[in-house]
Amino acid sequence: MAGATTAKGGARRTPPPGPPPPALKARRRLRLPRRRTLLVTGVATALLGSGVTWLLYGSSWLRVEQVAVSGTAALTPGEVREAAAIPLNEPLAAVDTDSVERRLRARLSRIADVDVSRSWPDTIAVRVTERRPEAIVEKAGKFLEVDEEGVLFATVPQAPKGVPLLQVEADRSPSSRHFGATRLRREAVAVIAQLPEKVRADTLSVRVRSYDSIALGLTRGRTVVWGSSERGAAKAKTLTALMKAVPDAERYDVSAPTAPAVTHS
């Protein structure tokens, strides 16, 4: 029997002639507004990006008007600004803060750490941490400051108050050839850091003859034989007990903290 093809027979039904269904008409009407929305959004984004770029780099606003320096002690803010070499009136966003940090470390050896950041709308902030002298080395009538790593970082005309004099006398010692001067200075500074507070305040000098031969010169002509920087906590505890038990001794030997010795004058 002839007639319309049905879904039961497996053939695709042909849509009837006439106007499209309402749902299809609605979808077609939505396409144009969506395209317009995308176009408007794209143009607005481009304009916004151009405006931000102009504001950051092309306008007279948001430019460097001052360089604020904090954290200085021996250095002055003026010295830090000069070494930083940040031009005023430059766009704040154009300042390469990493390059400024590298420049400061290279030009000012007294700086241990530095952080350079933007402080909107018109300031570059430079926060420095200076090296502290843990010991000094005398040379040609001047004094070289030694930091906690044993590095010589600055020359001063006068010895800083309360900083012990470091004497490295290991030129002919195998320790000097094996470890090097910087390592021996670092070991000496490590010993200073391990001292009891009162002993450290009384320490006038530190003498290094080799890696395991470090001695301290104290006030009132007293001497402490420390040995190497190893077992520092045990040596400090033993030294405190010895000084309490024998306060008038001239020489205290804690190089072997379990078998200390004292010498009277």
Swiss-Prot record:
The keyword Hydrolase does not apply. InterPro entries: Cell_div_FtsQ/DivIB_C, FtsQ, FtsQ_DivIB, POTRA, POTRA_FtsQ_type. Residues 62-131 form the POTRA domain. Residues 1-35 are cytoplasmic. The keyword Transmembrane applies. Signal peptide: none annotated. Residues 1-25 are annotated as: Disordered. Residues 14-23 have a biased composition (Pro residues). GO terms for biological process: cell septum assembly; FtsZ-dependent cytokinesis. Belongs to the FtsQ/DivIB family. FtsQ subfamily. Essential cell division protein. This is Cell division protein FtsQ. It comes from Streptomyces bingchenggensis (strain BCW-1). The gene is ftsQ.
